[in-house]
Amino acid sequence: MAEGGFWKKLTNFFTASEEDEDIIEEDYMDEGYEAEEGTGFVPVQTRAVPVGSTIWVYQPSSFSFDVDSSFIGARIKDGYIIILNLQDLDDLSAQRLIDFVSGALYSVEGKLKAISSSVFLLVPKNVRVESFNEGFGTE
Protein backbone atom coordinates (compact mmCIF):
# COMPACT_ATOMS: atom_id res chain seq x y z
CA MET A 1 0.00 0.00 0.00
CA ALA A 2 1.46 3.31 -1.02
CA GLU A 3 1.76 5.90 1.69
CA GLY A 4 0.74 8.71 -0.65
CA GLY A 5 -2.52 6.92 -1.47
CA PHE A 6 -3.67 6.81 2.16
CA TRP A 7 -2.99 10.50 2.79
CA LYS A 8 -4.58 11.48 -0.51
CA LYS A 9 -7.76 9.55 0.34
CA LEU A 10 -7.84 11.06 3.82
CA THR A 11 -7.34 14.58 2.46
CA ASN A 12 -10.02 14.08 -0.20
CA PHE A 13 -12.44 12.81 2.43
CA PHE A 14 -12.20 16.04 4.43
CA THR A 15 -11.99 18.50 1.53
CA ALA A 16 -14.17 19.25 -1.47
CA SER A 17 -13.04 17.77 -4.74
CA GLU A 18 -13.12 19.56 -8.11
CA GLU A 19 -16.30 17.65 -8.98
CA ASP A 20 -18.02 19.00 -5.86
CA GLU A 21 -17.14 22.58 -6.81
CA ASP A 22 -19.09 22.24 -10.08
CA ILE A 23 -22.33 21.49 -8.23
CA ILE A 24 -24.52 24.55 -7.73
CA GLU A 25 -27.07 24.32 -4.96
CA GLU A 26 -30.23 26.32 -5.44
CA ASP A 27 -32.97 27.07 -2.96
CA TYR A 28 -36.39 26.84 -4.49
CA MET A 29 -39.98 26.85 -3.35
CA ASP A 30 -43.02 25.33 -4.95
CA GLU A 31 -45.58 27.65 -6.50
CA GLY A 32 -48.09 28.82 -3.90
CA TYR A 33 -45.84 27.99 -0.96
CA GLU A 34 -45.80 30.55 1.82
CA ALA A 35 -43.33 30.43 4.67
CA GLU A 36 -45.00 29.94 8.04
CA GLU A 37 -44.04 31.48 11.33
CA GLY A 38 -42.02 28.95 13.32
CA THR A 39 -43.54 27.49 16.44
CA GLY A 40 -40.37 25.61 17.32
CA PHE A 41 -38.58 25.62 20.60
CA VAL A 42 -36.90 28.76 21.80
CA PRO A 43 -33.95 28.24 24.13
CA VAL A 44 -34.54 29.50 27.65
CA GLN A 45 -31.81 31.74 28.94
CA THR A 46 -30.92 31.09 32.54
CA ARG A 47 -30.09 33.89 34.88
CA ALA A 48 -28.16 33.81 38.08
CA VAL A 49 -30.42 34.36 41.07
CA PRO A 50 -29.18 37.55 42.71
CA VAL A 51 -28.80 37.82 46.47
CA GLY A 52 -31.96 39.27 47.96
CA SER A 53 -34.20 37.82 45.25
CA THR A 54 -37.93 37.63 45.78
CA ILE A 55 -39.29 34.33 47.05
CA TRP A 56 -43.01 33.92 46.44
CA VAL A 57 -45.12 32.16 49.08
CA TYR A 58 -48.41 31.03 47.58
CA GLN A 59 -51.21 29.45 49.63
CA PRO A 60 -54.44 29.14 47.65
CA SER A 61 -57.58 28.64 49.74
CA SER A 62 -59.62 27.51 46.74
CA PHE A 63 -58.59 26.29 43.32
CA SER A 64 -59.25 27.99 40.01
CA PHE A 65 -57.10 26.35 37.35
CA ASP A 66 -57.07 29.44 35.10
CA VAL A 67 -56.08 31.87 37.87
CA ASP A 68 -53.72 29.65 39.87
CA SER A 69 -51.93 28.13 36.88
CA SER A 70 -51.43 31.57 35.27
CA PHE A 71 -50.05 33.06 38.45
CA ILE A 72 -47.68 30.21 39.26
CA GLY A 73 -46.75 29.52 35.63
CA ALA A 74 -45.67 33.13 35.06
CA ARG A 75 -43.45 33.08 38.15
CA ILE A 76 -41.90 29.73 37.20
CA LYS A 77 -41.21 31.07 33.70
CA ASP A 78 -39.60 34.21 35.17
CA GLY A 79 -37.28 32.11 37.36
CA TYR A 80 -38.68 32.89 40.80
CA ILE A 81 -38.35 30.62 43.82
CA ILE A 82 -41.83 29.67 45.08
CA ILE A 83 -43.03 28.09 48.30
CA LEU A 84 -46.36 26.47 47.53
CA ASN A 85 -48.58 25.65 50.53
CA LEU A 86 -51.53 23.45 49.57
CA GLN A 87 -52.86 22.65 53.05
CA ASP A 88 -56.17 24.48 52.43
CA LEU A 89 -56.94 22.64 49.16
CA ASP A 90 -58.79 19.37 48.79
CA ASP A 91 -56.69 16.41 47.60
CA LEU A 92 -57.98 16.46 43.99
CA SER A 93 -57.33 20.19 43.53
CA ALA A 94 -53.90 19.91 45.15
CA GLN A 95 -53.00 17.02 42.83
CA ARG A 96 -54.12 18.97 39.73
CA LEU A 97 -52.01 21.94 40.77
CA ILE A 98 -48.96 19.75 41.48
CA ASP A 99 -49.39 18.08 38.07
CA PHE A 100 -49.43 21.49 36.37
CA VAL A 101 -46.48 22.78 38.40
CA SER A 102 -44.47 19.64 37.62
CA GLY A 103 -44.98 20.16 33.89
CA ALA A 104 -44.14 23.85 34.09
CA LEU A 105 -40.96 23.13 36.06
CA TYR A 106 -39.99 20.39 33.62
CA SER A 107 -40.25 22.84 30.72
CA VAL A 108 -37.69 25.17 32.34
CA GLU A 109 -35.60 22.37 33.90
CA GLY A 110 -36.66 23.48 37.39
CA LYS A 111 -37.06 21.31 40.48
CA LEU A 112 -39.88 20.46 42.89
CA LYS A 113 -38.93 19.60 46.47
CA ALA A 114 -41.50 18.38 49.01
CA ILE A 115 -41.03 20.15 52.34
CA SER A 116 -44.01 18.39 53.94
CA SER A 117 -47.07 16.55 52.62
CA SER A 118 -48.69 19.86 51.65
CA VAL A 119 -45.78 22.32 51.28
CA PHE A 120 -43.52 22.33 48.22
CA LEU A 121 -40.47 24.29 47.13
CA LEU A 122 -40.31 25.21 43.42
CA VAL A 123 -36.90 26.36 42.19
CA PRO A 124 -35.37 27.23 38.81
CA LYS A 125 -32.56 25.07 37.45
CA ASN A 126 -29.78 27.38 38.62
CA VAL A 127 -30.76 27.03 42.31
CA ARG A 128 -29.30 24.20 44.36
CA VAL A 129 -31.46 22.81 47.17
CA GLU A 130 -29.69 21.17 50.09
CA SER A 131 -31.33 19.45 53.05
CA PHE A 132 -30.11 19.26 56.61
CA ASN A 133 -32.47 17.48 58.98
CA GLU A 134 -30.22 15.97 61.61
CA GLY A 135 -30.33 17.90 64.86
CA PHE A 136 -32.74 20.55 63.64
CA GLY A 137 -34.72 22.03 66.51
CA THR A 138 -32.64 20.38 69.22
CA GLU A 139 -29.96 21.94 71.36
From Swiss-Prot:
Keywords: Cell cycle, Cell division, Cytoplasm, Septation
Function as written in the Swiss-Prot or TrEMBL entry: Cell division protein that is part of the divisome complex and is recruited early to the Z-ring. Probably stimulates Z-ring formation, perhaps through the cross-linking of FtsZ protofilaments. Its function overlaps with FtsA.
UniProt feature coiled coil, ranges: none
Family the entry assigns: Belongs to the SepF family.
Compartments (UniProt record): Cytoplasm
GO cellular component, one term: cytoplasm
Oligomer and partners: Homodimer. Interacts with FtsZ.
Domain of life: Bacteria
An example Gene Ontology biological process: division septum assembly
UniProt xrefs under HAMAP family: SepF (MF_01197)
Originating gene: sepF
Name by which UniProt lists this protein: Cell division protein SepF
